[in-house]
Swiss-Prot record:
EC identifiers of the protein: 3.1.-.-
One GO MF term attached to the UniProt entry: metal ion binding
Keyword Acetylation: no
Residues that span the membrane, as ranges: 15-32
Protein name: Probable endonuclease LCL3
Length: 226
């Protein structure tokens, strides 16, 4: 009888410690997948985290006036980024395969030359403004939806001396774009009216792309004529 009692006691201990170990493994996997898994392309981002999560990382390249490439650094400095693990170089060749392509929500910048077609006035200036504002900076991106080009429509926020700034909002304030006119993939995060007011104000002040004389063709109108 004592031997049977010892066996039962040992079995109970094994079950107890196995349960603890299993629970620890499952908890670790959950924490990793939610907070420390690094996403390298749109296809890797689970649909369930759109509109509910933000991602932190470094802007590694800006190729147009309303989109950029973003190197996801989950956990930020707490996970060693910037001191134990180096940030990637900006504009590094081949890094595109390791980054998320972010399309700024709610805005449209002047088109630059492509496919042999002449670009719009102030397209290069809009690109330079965005580069100077976020290239090489850490940003936090709220994910809204993937678009038809494999990008992620998202809202980016960056810290400046005067506080955290929404990049789409600042772009419109400075006149380097218009409120997004398309119907497909339109995202405003509840700021549609504000964005229209900011565009109208920039037009009135004739700043940014609105410095040009004569009729102003918006990016949406320009793309319709392609």
């Amino acid at each position: 009888m004592p031997e049977d009692s010892n066996k039962a006691s040992n079995t109970a201990r094994v079950v107890f410690y196995t349960s603890i170990l299993t629970g620890g493994i499952l908890s670790s996997f959950y924490v990793y997948s939610r907070y420390f898994r690094r996403f390298t392309c749109t296809a890797e981002v689970p649909k369930k985290i759109y509109r509910g999560r933000t991602l932190f990382g470094r802007v590694t390249s800006v190729g147009d006036g309303d989109n950029f490439h973003f190197y996801h650094t989950p956990g930020g400095r707490l996970a060693g980024w910037g001191w134990l693990r180096p940030y990637p170089e900006t504009n590094k060749r081949g890094l595109g395969k390791e980054t998320l392509h972010i399309r700024l929500y709610g805005v449209d910048a002047p088109e630059r030359p492509h496919f042999g077609r002449q670009g719009q006035p102030y397209g290069d200036e809009a690109l330079e403004w965005l580069r100077s504002y976020i290239l090489g900076r850490n940003v936090r991106v709220k994910l809204f939806s993937p678009d038809q080009y494999g990008r992620i429509v998202g809202g980016a926020k960056v810290w400046k001396l005067t506080g955290r700034k929404d990049v789409s909002t600042e772009m419109l304030k400075n006149g380097w774009g218009v409120k997004y006119e398309g119907k497909m993939g339109a995202e405003f995060n509840g700021k549609g009216k504000l964005f229209q007011k900011l565009e109208d104000h920039a037009r009135k002040k004739k700043i940014g792309m609105f410095q040009q004389k004569g009729k102003i063709v918006t990016p949406g109108q320009y793309k319709k004529d392609e």
